[in-house]
Regions:
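Charged, often flexible domain-edge or linker segments that flank or initiate folded functional domains
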Residues: 1-166, 209-326, 330, 691
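Non-catalytic DNA-recognition/assembly elements of restriction-modification systems
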Residues: 463-507, 519, 526, 635-698
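Polybasic, glycine- and aromatic-enriched phosphate-binding surface used to engage nucleic acids
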Residues: 18-20, 24, 479-642
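Structural motif
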Residues: 98-115, 123, 127, 186-191, ...
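Class I S-adenosyl-L-methionine
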Residues: 156-230, 610-616, 625
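Signature of N6-adenine DNA methyltransferases within the class I
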Residues: 1-8, 15-16, 30, 34-42, ...
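Generic, well-ordered alpha-helical scaffold segments in large soluble proteins
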Residues: 18, 196, 200, 204, ...
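Active-site-adjacent bridging/hinge elements
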Residues: 84-97, 191-205, 259-260, 344-353, ...
Length: 698
């Protein structure tokens, strides 16, 4: 059979790196292609898997890079997952800590034994099973007693046996590691203790490669509560008993635990590709449902009958949600969950997804985008989808396709901005609720919760694939539209040169804090403030063709140019007429708008009006070229420009330690700019108060 080859782009997707990083690795010899066709590099699938495994194992030096933390391995306590008052929280913490200290290898058998022990002890704590007297001080023997068939647990046997899997291997492991089972667990209603334990002992590297970031219980409770309320308000009472609810990426069943309190057992469906997670989810669902029944009927035992057990096995399955079956699909009234983020699909699955899904583009596949598309396909008309997703899905360019799918099939019902909810993951998240609609693409009536504030969008904003404007109140949005549609304006689109700062490829090698022969000062983003920049304290070798990435030198040497902070939530532009080089944290724009002076354009870009447009339209920490090009620039006459430029020159010349004078000058300039936009005093006060920060950055 012939060797299968993949492109550089596909290799980058497999390694979870950008294409730019892949090109750099290729250029630097960190990776090697196996053949070239028409100038394009190709890599054998065997080689691609070798590189990926080298990253996972740490053999590949680039693993040490900050950008490749995805492949770091180890065990860690997932402290945001359960409620603070969960009684087993400290128990799991101590066990996980002990495993880290002992550097115990977490084999599949080890994980299964530890998890089965936890499941069995939770069941015992609820039911007070017979023959358990006297074992409180011999916790390490309980699972062994069960394995040797000295404990009758009825229908629960199938669930516990599935978790154990191989009893012979379990016996051997227990004999060698009894101390690790000297742990007590009590059943905690509404808490996924098994999930907490599983995440805390599972290899972090494999968890991240699978995109597994399990949802904290408080977020799950909010989602389930809101979606059930929404559903029962829209579904006829007679139809409520026929509703189907699906978690397509159920993990260990945290959503199922909360759903089973309000949805009948037979109406709950779930799936996942992790077999052990599914087995734990089945146990969790069975125990929660049985405990609910025990409470409601005031009986002494948790009642799990064969009929309920069969429902659980029929409805909670180990399968790939994204694989479309030939048989007719079942439609659901609710789909809820937390789809995987950044899952590393293999080559065959990527090929399959490319053929089946609009969101599976050739430039890379984001797993949660495809989950949203598939879920909307399986949602009944009027049905509700609610997922935990990165906030980036609202407006980042890479997610344009999924926004188009959403706009073509649904309306937005609710958005909650929940911040960095996942342990060890710095990525702001949202819970996004969509309602399947035959007349889709609307936001009217959407409930928004952000930064402690709640509001409802009353005036509809049609959903655009370019970005979903749901962060703003109606008043903020109306002001934004007025500014963007100001008359007598132009823009920098097609009327400016843009350039990135220099990427050296090795800052330790090429950048010095001392001026040496052949070196010149270089401006960094941290040096730049509005209208000027600090004296440089870094130096770089001249001759920019030696570096990994540099713009044509004539752009750095332009007689005058504007430089700006690339990574920043505020627009910060400075004037440079000394032909300075800049690093990649500091980019360049050279306006060529006929009739408009460069310092005048700088005054507009540094204004609160421009900041409002940038902040409210894009909510970005990166100032992109497209952001700058979108800002309307008023066409001022020569007299007004001259007046502003005199004030700008005065501000530039004003010493930095004279903060009061600089701020007054900034405010005076800003007042003229706002009048050019036609902004009255009341709207100007609103704009100033609506900005997230009041820093002058002077």
């Amino acid at each position: 059979m012939s060797e299968k080859y993949i492109t550089l782009e596909e290799l980058c997707g497999l390694l979870s790196i950008t294409k730019a990083t892949g090109r750099n690795w290729l250029r630097l010899g960190k990776i090697e292609s196996q053949k070239q066709i028409d100038g394009q590099e190709y890599f054998s699938e065997e080689y691609a898997l070798y590189i990926r495994n080298a990253l996972v194992s740490g053999e590949f030096d680039s693993l040490k890079s900050r950008r490749n933390k995805k492949y770091v391995s180890g065990k860690a306590f997932y402290d945001k997952y359960v409620s603070d008052n969960c009684g087993s929280r400290e128990t799991v913490f101590e066990l996980a800590g002990g495993l880290i200290e002992s550097d115990e290898a977490m084999t599949d058998t080890a994980m299964r034994v530890i998890l089965a022990d936890c499941a069995l002890k939770q069941l015992i704590s609820v039911d007070n099973l017979e023959n358990m007297e006297g074992l409180q001080d011999r916790e390490e023997e309980i699972l062994s007693i069960y394995i040797e068939n000295n404990m009758d647990i009825g229908c629960w046997k199938r669930l516990i046996d599935d978790i154990i899997d191989d009893k012979d291997k379990a016996r051997i492991w227990i004999n060698e590691n009894k101390d690790l089972l000297r742990v007590h667990y009590d059943y905690q209603p509404g808490e996924d203790v098994l999930g907490l334990l599983y995440m805390s002992i599972k290899d972090i590297g494999s968890r991240k490669a699978a995109g597994s970031y399990y949802t904290p219980t408080d977020v799950v409770k909010q989602m389930v509560s809101g979606i059930v309320e929404n559903l029962y308000n829209t579904v006829e009472k007679n139809d409520a008993g026929h509703m189907r609810v699906l978690d397509p990426c159920c993990g260990t069943g945290n959503f199922l635990i909360q759903l089973s309190k309000v949805i009948p057992l037979g109406q709950i469906y779930a799936c996942d590709i992790d077999e052990l997670s599914v087995q734990l989810a089945r146990f969790n669902l069975a125990l929660t449902s049985s405990y609910q029944c025990k409470k409601e009927k005031a009986i002494s035992k948790t009642s799990l009958n064969i009929e309920d057990l069969n429902k659980i096995y029929d409805n909670i399955t180990c399968r790939n949600f994204l694989t479309k079956e030939d048989t007719e699909d079942i439609y659901f009234d609710v789909i809820i969950g937390n789809p995987p983020w950044g899952y590393a699909f293999d080559c065959d699955m990527r090929d399959y997804l490319h053929k089946k899904y609009r969101t599976a583009g050739r430039r890379g596949i984001e797993s949660y985008d495809v989950f949203v598309e598939r879920s909307l396909e399986l949602l009944a008309d009027g049905g509700v989808l609610e997922f935990v997703l990165p906030e980036a899905i609202l407006d980042v360019r890479n997610h344009r396709d999924v926004r188009q799918v959403i706009a073509d099939n649904s309306d937005i019902g609710r958005v909650r901005f929940v911040g960095d909810v996942f342990h060890g993951v710095q990525c702001p998240a949202i819970t996004l609720q969509l309602v399947k609609s035959s007349a889709p693409g609307h936001t009217e009536g959407a409930a928004i919760e952000r930064n402690g504030q709640k509001f409802v969008i009353c005036n509809d904003r049609h959903l655009s694939p370019d970005g979903f404007q749901v962060r703003l109140s109606d008043e903020e949005y109306e002001v934004l539209l007025r500014l963007e549609n100001t008359g007598n304006c132009t823009s920098l689109r097609g009327q400016a040169d843009f350039a990135l700062g220099i990427v050296t490829g090795d800052n330790k090698k090429y950048i010095s804090v001392e001026l040496q022969n052949g070196m010149e000062p270089v401006v960094t983003g941290a040096d730049v403030y509005r209208y000027g920049h600090d004296k440089c304290d870094k130096y770089i070798l001249s001759g920019f063709d030696r570096y990994q990435q540099a713009a044509p030198e004539k752009l750095y040497r332009a007689p005058e140019k504007l430089i700006y902070r690339f990574i920043n939530r505020q627009l910060v532009f400075a004037y440079d007429d000394r032909q300075m080089a800049t690093l990649n944290s500091c980019n360049i724009v050279i306006p060529h708008i006929q009739g408009l002076k460069m310092k005048y354009v700088m005054a507009v870009l540094n204004s609160r009006i421009a900041q409002y447009i940038y902040e409210k339209r894009y909510n970005s920490v990166k100032v992109l070229r497209s952001h700058i090009e979108s800002i309307p620039i008023p066409l001022a006459d020569e007299e007004i420009q001259a007046q502003l430029i005199r004030m700008v020159d005065h501000l530039i010349e004003c010493p930095r330690d004279n903060a009061e004078e600089k701020c007054k000058l900034y405010d005076d300039i800003d007042d003229i700019v706002r009048q050019l936009y036609g902004v009255n005093s009341a709207d100007y006060e609103f704009i100033k108060n609506a900005l997230s920060g009041c820093k002058y950055m002077l």
